[in-house]
Amino acid sequence: MAATRVLTAATAVTQTTSCFLAKQAFTLPAKKSCGGFGGLCFSRRALVLKSKRPFSCSAIYNPQVKVQEEGPAESLDYRVFFLDGSGKKVSPWHDIPLTLGDGVFNFIVEIPKESKAKMEVATDEDFTPIKQDTKKGKLRYYPYNINWNYGLLPQTWEDPSHANSEVEGCFGDNDPVDVVEIGETQRKIGDILKIKPLAALAMIDEGELDWKIVAISLDDPKAHLVNDVEDVEKHFPGTLTAIRDWFRDYKIPDGKPANRFGLGDKPANKDYALKIIQETNESWAKLVKRSVDAGDLSLY
């Protein structure tokens, strides 16, 4: 029998049953800040792109989202589906809204901190449930626990046809943008958190660009203390280095080379992270509008 739990998810900007451009423009005031941890500096003036508004498609409005687990945990059949208030399956990737305004975003937990089962949204399955990743028919695990909550930003996509000129011309990894949430609480698979981005790391995995947005949940006791990359080093000393080193080295025990990082091997600041989020939201919008080839990706 499927197990079901109810989450209180953040609501969308406006109610909708079809694709729309949100009324609130995703813009930032002109300001310049630099990360104290050797962080890259990014001016908000440069964040004005062709499209200033976050794109959202069929974003759910009902704050009650049910998470339904099907199949035994840590099995090939295990899936975590998301249901709306009527019990209809929805996609955590496509139907949960990205932005809530005022620099706050929805974050969906795939892997709870202090666990090592490699969970991910199944981007090629209907309704994109969360499942455990496999290789050659076997379940995948990290060689050691991940020390932070890990998951995705909904309604984002790293376009594999787009070469990033700022990161060695690397192409996107064809997945939603990853988030590393540094709060103290261990979350559950499928939890939806309100987070604020703090920094970004440009990981290069076998030649593909795989952004890691460092963020914190708004309900964490230290959330009010951190607003940018330099605050992370002050209030979470050593965390940015630990995140970089963990993702650099986790494949080594399997005999693979270490991952690399662009942008001078340094974390970029909050403004740069927001730029990445906006750009990948625009890429996702092109995907769901079928302006680019979706390949095997599920669009519902």
UniProtKB/Swiss-Prot annotation:
GO biological process entries: phosphate-containing compound metabolic process
What's the protein name?
A: Soluble inorganic pyrophosphatase 6, chloroplastic
Similarity comment text for this entry: Belongs to the PPase family.
Q: What are the inducing conditions?
A: By glucose, frustose or sucrose at 300 mM, but not at 100 mM.
The listed locations are: Plastid, Chloroplast stroma
Q: How does activity depend on pH?
A: Optimum pH is 7.5. Activity is extremely low below pH 6.5. Activity decreases slightly at more basic pHs, activity at pH 9.0 was only 10% less than that found at pH 7.5.
Please tell me where Mg(2+) 2 binds in this chain.
178
Its GO CC terms? chloroplast; chloroplast envelope; chloroplast stroma; plasma membrane; plastid; thylakoid
- Molecular function terms from GO: inorganic diphosphate phosphatase activity; magnesium ion binding
Give the required cofactors. Answer: Mg(2+)
Q: Where does Mg(2+) 1 bind?
A: 173, 178, 210
Q: Which positions bind diphosphate?
A: 140
Q: Quote the tissue specificity entry.
A: Expressed in all tissues tested. Highest expression in flowers, leaves and roots. Lower levels of expression in siliques, stems, ovary, stigma and pollen.
Q: Which UniProt keywords apply?
A: Chloroplast, Hydrolase, Magnesium, Metal-binding, Plastid, Transit peptide
Quote the gene name from the UniProt entry. Answer: PPA6
Reaction(s) this enzyme catalyzes, per UniProt: diphosphate + H2O = 2 phosphate + H(+)
Source organism, top-level taxon = Eukaryota
Q: Extract the transit peptide range from the record.
A: 1-66
Name of the top EC class for this enzyme: hydrolase
Q: What is its EC number?
A: 3.6.1.1
Which CDD domains does the UniProt entry name for this protein?
pyrophosphatase (cd00412)
| Catalytic-site annotation from UniProt | 142
Record text on activity regulation: Inhibited by NaF.
InterPro entries with a match to the protein in the record: Pyrophosphatase, Pyrophosphatase_sf
